[in-house]
C-alpha cells in the first residue's frame, strides 16, 4: 500500500507497476506482488516476463578462432586468431566479444558489430541490449555495438583509480567495476536512455574485503557476484 499521487497515463502506471514488481521480486522470499496506490490497485498481471539469462555458456578462444564450447565440441563464431578473454551475450549466444591485440572486437553470427580501440586486459562485457563494454580509464569506459561506433560512458568515483574491467549484470541494471592499484571491486547503477543505450555508471559502492585484492569478478545472477 502506497500513499502518493497516481500516474495519469496508462503507460506511466504500467512502468510504475513494472519497476516495483521487478524490484521487490529480486528478494528470494518474494514471489508475488500486489500494489495499491492511494487505494487504487495497479494491474501487475500484464507485466512482461524477463528473458532467460544464460550465465553458464562456455565460450573459448584458440588458434581456430572464437566459439561456443559444448559437450559435442566447439561451434566457431569467429576466425580471429589473436583473441583472448572471450565473452558472450547473456541472451544471444551468437553475439561474442573478445580482446585482440589492438582493441576489443565483437561479432554476431560472424558479422562484425563493434570495435573498441585500446586495451581491456581482463576482457570485455556484453549486456542484454547488445552493447559491448571494453577499454576504460579512471573516469569512463568505451562502449560500442551501435551504428555510431564507440563512445565513452562516464563512471563515477574517478579518485578510486584506473578501471581494469567493467562487468554488466545479466539484467543490464548494474555494473561491477574493478579498479585501483589494489584492484578493489565496486557496484554501481547503469543509467540508460529509452533505447537501452548506456549513459553513465553512478552510485558506486565499494565491496568490503577482509584482506587481499580482487583478481577478477563475475555476476552469478542479476544481483549475485563472485570475486576471485
Predicted region positions:
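Bimodal "functional hotspot" detector
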Residues: 1-228
Amino acid at each position: 500500500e502506497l500513499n502518493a499521487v497516481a500516474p495519469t497515463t496508462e503507460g506511466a502506471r504500467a512502468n510504475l507497476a513494472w519497476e516495483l514488481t521487478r524490484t521487490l521480486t529480486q528478494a528470494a522470499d518474494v514471489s508475488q506482488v500486489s500494489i495499491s496506490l492511494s487505494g487504487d490497485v495497479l494491474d501487475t498481471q500484464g507485466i512482461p516476463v524477463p528473458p532467460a539469462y544464460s550465465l553458464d555458456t562456455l565460450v573459448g578462444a584458440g588458434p581456430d578462432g572464437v566459439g561456443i564450447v559444448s559437450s559435442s565440441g566447439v561451434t566457431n563464431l569467429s576466425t580471429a586468431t589473436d583473441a583472448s578473454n572471450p565473452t558472450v551475450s547473456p541472451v544471444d549466444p551468437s553475439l561474442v566479444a573478445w580482446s585482440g591485440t589492438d582493441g576489443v572486437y565483437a561479432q554476431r553470427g560472424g558479422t562484425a558489430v563493434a570495435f573498441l580501440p585500446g586495451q581491456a586486459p581482463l576482457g570485455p562485457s556484453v549486456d542484454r541490449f547488445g552493447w559491448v563494454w571494453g577499454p576504460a580509464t579512471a573516469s569512463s569506459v568505451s562502449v560500442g555495438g551501435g551504428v555510431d561506433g564507440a563512445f565513452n560512458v562516464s563512471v563515477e568515483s574517478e579518485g578510486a583509480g584506473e578501471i581494469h574491467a567493467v562487468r554488466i549484470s545479466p539484467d543490464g541494471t548494474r555494473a561491477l567495476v574493478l579498479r585501483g592499484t589494489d584492484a578493489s571491486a565496486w557496484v554501481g547503477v547503469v543509467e540508460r536512455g529509452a533505447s537501452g543505450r548506456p549513459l553513465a555508471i553512478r552510485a558506486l559502492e565499494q565491496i568490503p574485503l577482509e584482506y587481499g585484492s580482487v583478481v577478477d569478478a563475475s555476476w552469478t545472477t542479476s544481483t549475485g557476484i563472485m570475486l576471485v
